[in-house]
Each structure stands twice: as C-alpha cells, then as structure tokens.
Amino acid sequence: MVSVQNLKTDQLLNFLFKNPTKFLSRFSPMAKNKTLVTPSTVKKSSDVASTSKKLSGVASPAKKPSGVTSPVKKPLEAVASTSSEEEEEDEPSSDSESGSESESDTEAEPMTLAAAAPSSSNEKRQSEGKPEEERAKTETETGKKPLLFQRLWTDEDEIVFLQGMIKFAKDTGKNVSEDMNGFFEKLKDSISFEVKTDQFVNKIRSMKRKYIENKKTTTEHDKKCYELAEIIWVSDGDATALVKPKKKKLKVDEESDWFERSFVDGAFKELGPGVDEETWKKNWSLVPVKKRKRIEEKVKSMQADELKTTWQKIDVVHEMRSLMAKYV
C-alpha cells in the first residue's frame, strides 16, 4: 500500500480526485488534526500558490521578497518549514538591524567630521580675536588707549631748557650756538630722558618757530615758554646778549664811529678841556638808547644842512669866477 507521505504533490492530487471517499476513510486522523485536504482546498491552495509566484516575481527595492509557503506541502514537514521560515525572517530582521546600525554609524561619522570642521574654524576665529581682546583688556585696565607716538620732551623739560639757555649765556657770556657742546654738557643731566646733541639743536629751532614765528600761546605752559622765548629772542636786553652778541658789538662799533665822526666829540673837547676821549665815550654809552638816537638825528640833520650850505658856497664861488672872467 502506497503511503501518502511518500507521494509527491501531483500524485497526491490525482489520488485525491480519483478516490476521495477512500482518502477520507483512510486518513481520518489527519482530518481530526484539521490537516485534511479536500478538492476545494486544493484548488484554493493552487490559486494561492499561483498568486504567490506572481508576487514573488516582482522584486522589492528595499528588501528581498519573503518566500510564500505553498499550502500543498507534506503534512509532517509543515511545522518544521514554518519554524525555519520564522527563523529566516528573524535573521533578516537582525541583519536589517545590523545594517541599520552600520548605516547609522556611517551617517554618524560625517556628522562628527562636520562638527569638527566648525569647531576648528571657531578656534581659528577665537585665535584671531585674541589680540583684539588683549588690546581691549589693556585699554580697560589702563583707562586709555596706547599712544602711537610718545612725547619725549615734557612740559617741565621745556621750561628747564629755556631757563638753561638764559643762565648759560649769563654765566659764560657766550651764545648757545657758539658753544653747543658746553651747553649740552651743562644741561643734559637736567632733562628727564637720555638726550643727544642733535635733539638740543632741533629743540631750539622748533621752540623758536613755535613761540616767536607762530606765537602759539594756547595753554598756560605755552604762555610761560613764550615769556622765556621773548627774553631769549625778542627783548632788547637779554635777547641781544644771548642770541645776537655779534650784531650788538657791531652796533656799538657803529655808534662809536658815529661818535668819533660827529662834531660832538670836538665840541666836548672844546667845552670840557682836560677830559680825555675815552671818558667821554664811556659816559656817552651810559645814556639811554632812545635819547642817544634823538641826539643822533639832530646831528645828522645839522650835517645835512652844513652840506647844503657848503654846496651853496661852492655855487657862489663859481658864479664869482665866471663874472670875473667875463669882465677882466
């Protein structure tokens, strides 16, 4: 007798269609287990199998199509096949989970790189902003911005410098331009910084230009410096002695020459016999300048009148000679 378990699917179907009553009587235990196969169920299963084949022919882009179990399998192998299919379905899920984890890992790596790139740019910006922050910090600590040009000469240095020029001329009788080295050696220790000779020369020029030529007196310090500069370069007293001693000497010589050329010298000798010429010159030099100039103008006017009178005398003499030549 042929066993149903050893029959193939086609043979089982033929046997079922030919001997349905015999099949039901022989295999009643299978009917009790609800595994009985009738022609209607076989027809339905064939339809399902054909439909599953059609569906399995279409490939899914995301996942592999899961295999559809045919209902016309061997009865004893059904449970094992279903359990194996469940295990296979579990395995792809685990594979998909591992794949999703790997995909998440691969996606996380660019994110970390992208996050690292802005951090490096932020560090660069922070490093570039450090000098500005340090400069702002120094400004807040000191309370003022750092000066691009620091002034060497202080107000006190300028006052000491001008006073030193006046004192040097009085003590030595020399102009600072005549003995710049001596003036430098005498005053360099009184300046607040380590000064050089060329700085002394430039300072004299700049202060003369500022206070004498431009007459800049905007502050109290400028006013004090202007007063000292007037003593050195403007006034008749100390200015002539400090800055222009040669011109004054020349002026004194011109006055002495005028004194000698004028008739006053002879008149003094006539009016005061017994007084030598040097005494007269010395006494005359003690007279104020304005009064001496007034006398000088009078003398020049008298000399001009005398010259005019002399030319008139000469004209008279020529006229007399011409008349005598005509009538003699």
From Swiss-Prot:
Residues 122-143 have a biased composition (Basic and acidic residues). Belongs to the GeBP family. InterPro entries: GEBP (IPR007592), GeBP-like_C (IPR053933), GeBP-like_DBD (IPR053932). Residues 35-54 have a biased composition (Polar residues). Residues 31-143 are annotated as: Disordered. This is Probable transcription factor At4g00610. GO terms for biological process: regulation of DNA-templated transcription. It holds the Pfam family GeBP-like_DBD. Residues 84-108 have a biased composition (Acidic residues). Coiled coil: none annotated. Keywords: Transcription, Transcription regulation. It comes from the Eukaryota.
